[in-house]
A protein has these predicted regions:
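Basic Arg/Gly/Lys-rich low-complexity intrinsically disordered segments
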Residues: 1-75, 271-297
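Generic helix N-cap/helix-start motif at coil->alpha-helix transitions
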Residues: 43-44, 75-82, 108-116, 143-151, ...
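Alpha-helical segment of the N-proximal tetratricopeptide repeat
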Residues: 70-114, 118, 124
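Residue-level signature for tetratricopeptide repeat
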Residues: 88, 120-122, 153-155, 192, ...
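Structural motif corresponding to the intra-repeat A-B loop/turn of tetratricopeptide repeats
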Residues: 92-93, 126, 159, 196, ...
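TPR-repeat structural position
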Residues: 95-96, 129, 162, 199, ...
Length: 297
């Protein structure tokens, strides 16, 4: 457990349309509603969530620990525990709880870049795109790290500003991005083009040699998924099925729903069993008019 996510490839960004499941927590996870949260007056703010007792703060990775050493020892330990708790909450799928932990960490150590990074990525995961954008802008100013730009651009998409997303991506030459961030930037740019009703342009952005990468990188399933989803939007169903299948082959953990999309093309549907379970638990009349009572035992 690292405590603070490292760079945008650790965050969920979206390659489809706002509201799609990219099928995009990483370019490719379920997007949120993009609502802007309202800052509460200080007296109305909820208390910080309790940190689980088993979290010591020593679980934090070296990069984060190095930055936290700029703080007084006791404060640094508290912030480390908050960041580890946030990381655990994200792993458990509770983005709102992660955001609460990182908000408290920011209150205590808002001048530390990894704290702002953690809050930005937690807000992004929670669908609070306005907060995520503000925090990641701050990280970019503090560190000069351009690898956050794809996530920032995806926040603009979440706020229904696809043109701003494209403008932001255009500010940074691909040569200034890491290999992973370059791919994430293309996925987000393609999503923005689709938002603007330009699926052909989106497809061109995604037609890169990395689609056929032999090594399984974190971004490969999301890239193939975005490509397949764009093909499907263009009505190229046979090609789309091929690429959804190729995405599923490199997505054993199911970060995307590529396997389900393949099944849909094959005419297989998945039904929620929740309603059936509820029905099974409902009390039934002792004597149903449609059922003959059995013999007494």
């Amino acid at each position: 457990m690292t405590g603070a996510p490292r760079s945008p490839e650790s965050a969920p960004s979206r390659g489809g349309k706002p509201g799609d499941k990219p099928r995009g927590g990483k370019p490719g996870d379920k997007p949120r509603d993009g609502k802007t949260r309202v800052e509460r007056p200080r007296e109305d703010r909820p208390r910080a969530p309790r940190i689980p007792d088993d979290i010591t703060g020593k679980e934090i990775d070296r990069r984060v620990a190095a930055e936290l050493r700029t703080l007084p020892e006791e404060l640094g330990l508290t912030v480390a525990r908050l960041l580890v708790a946030a990381s655990r909450a994200l792993e458990d799928g509770d983005s709102d709880l992660a955001l609460a932990y990182t908000a408290e960490a920011k209150r205590l150590a808002g001048r530390v870049s990894v704290v702002r990074e953690a809050m930005g990525l937690a807000a992004y995961s929670a669908g609070d795109f306005a907060t995520a954008l503000a925090e990641l802008r701050a990280v970019r100013r503090m560190t000069g790290d351009q690898d956050f730009v794809p996530v920032m651009a995806d926040c603009e998409r979440g706020l229904e500003r696809p043109r701003k997303a494209l403008e932001l991506l255009a500010e940074v030459p691909e040569s200034e991005l890491s290999d992973a961030a370059r791919i994430e930037a293309r996925i987000v740019a393609a999503g923005a083009r689709r938002d603007l009703g330009q699926p052909d342009a989106a497809l061109l952005l995604l037609q890169v040699p990395q689609l056929n990468a032999r090594r399984t990188e974190d971004w490969l399933a999301r890239l193939r998924y975005a490509y397949a989803d764009t093909l499907a939007e263009l009505g190229r169903d046979q090609d789309a099925r091929v690429w959804f299948e190729r995405a599923a082959q490199v997505d054993p953990d199911g970060a995307t729903d590529a396997a389900e999309r393949v099944a849909e093309f094959d005419g297989i549907t998945f039904e929620d069993s929740w309603e059936d379970e509820v029905d099974d638990q409902r009390p039934t009349d002792a004597a149903s008019p449609d059922v003959e009572p059995g013999p007494s035992v």
